[in-house]
């Protein structure tokens, strides 16, 4: 979490909890017990809210990362909202289980469009369109789970940043 406080773009590819949207990370190698405890590998809302983020965009490439508890008058309160509360301007989430291969294709396209100067929403739109028009990923199950929450941001990349094939 300390490292996240100083970057403009955060990308987390991990597992998301179907019910809560909490994110399961690799356990910290410095855990104190013989077996990792839940706190060693689950990224909770309270962990995120305690951070002081300056990220313009957080990408949660995790199943169910748009999930949370629904509160009357508040809407969905989950990990994505915690990132916004901690200072992120925008969060890209998945609303349901995402296919690994389709997500890889989506993310490559998404980052390429961001690098070309498109806004996050335009990059999402173009990436969804590309999947939708493909033979392999034309079903909505593959291209429709991604949702942007927050501001429609642009990301400035360094000249030597590259989207790997």
Q: What are these model-predicted stretches?
A:
Residues 1-165:
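Catalytic cores of enzymes
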